[in-house]
Regions:
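Non-catalytic alpha-helical scaffolds and adjoining flexible linkers that form interface surfaces
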Residues: 1-22, 27-214
Length: 214
């Protein structure tokens, strides 16, 4: 009998598998990104149904399988159900998960990345912070975690933009979303982050397509 292991993290994606099962991509603090198979999670009344949705944070009890891990139970700490109540917030939130799914690696500890996803989703729900600012701060910090960053903006930038850039790279996670920028500086900041991101991860993100169409 396989020994159960407990991983702490967040569901990045959830897809149907066969009639009643789900295939999850879970970002964990202990093992980075893992594939988890949730047998019977789509059956009505299954205790795994709600716990295997995108955005769910918790402790995942699993056993090792042939192609990933098999889910036994989940102790949920946060569902982030409020994100789905607003379409724009839902798109930005989905993008955060998509980007993490693209960047995260297997068999590498990812505690800071898990915490970054959590705090960034919280920031999206903060009506005082523009979603575009949250997105760009998140992207730059993700680039830092992956080693794909520059100490200063790649384009010529204002002093305010440079200061914000260095702050995002150096600030403790808990202090990451404690500032705002003027529209002009945010546009400048966004342009520079977008350039770096395209070079490092030239991927296509479905959530951004939906966001553009709104």
């Amino acid at each position: 009998m396989q020994e159960e292991q407990i991983f702490h993290g967040v569901v990045l994606s959830s897809a149907p598998s066969r009639d009643f099962d789900k295939r999850l991509s879970v970002l964990t603090k202990e093992q980075g990104k893992i594939t988890v198979w949730a047998s019977g999670a789509k059956k009505p009344g299954s205790p795994l149904m709600a716990a295997t949705r995108n955005f769910v944070f918790g402790s995942f009890s699993v056993t090792k399988g042939r192609a990933g891990y098999n889910l036994r139970s989940v102790k949920v700490t946060e569902y982030f159900e409020e994100i789905a109540l607003d379409l724009v917030n839902a798109c930005y939130g989905s993008y955060l998960l998509e980007l993490a799914d693209a960047i995260a690696q297997e068999n590498l500890e990812a505690e800071e990345m898990v915490n970054l996803v959590y705090l960034s989703l919280r920031a999206i729900l903060n009506t005082k912070l523009p979603n575009e600012l949250v997105r760009r701060v998140y992207e730059l910090r993700m680039l830092l975690l992956n080693g794909e960053y520059t100490e200063l903006p790649p384009f010529e930038a204002s002093e305010s933009c440079c200061y914000a850039w260095q702050y995002v790279l150096a600030a403790p996670l808990a202090k990451l979303y404690t500032f705002t920028l003027t529209e002009e500086v945010l546009a400048e900041f966004s342009k520079n982050v977008a350039l770096l991101l395209r070079e490092a991860f030239p991927y296509h993100f479905r959530s951004l397509d939906i966001l553009k169409a709104l």
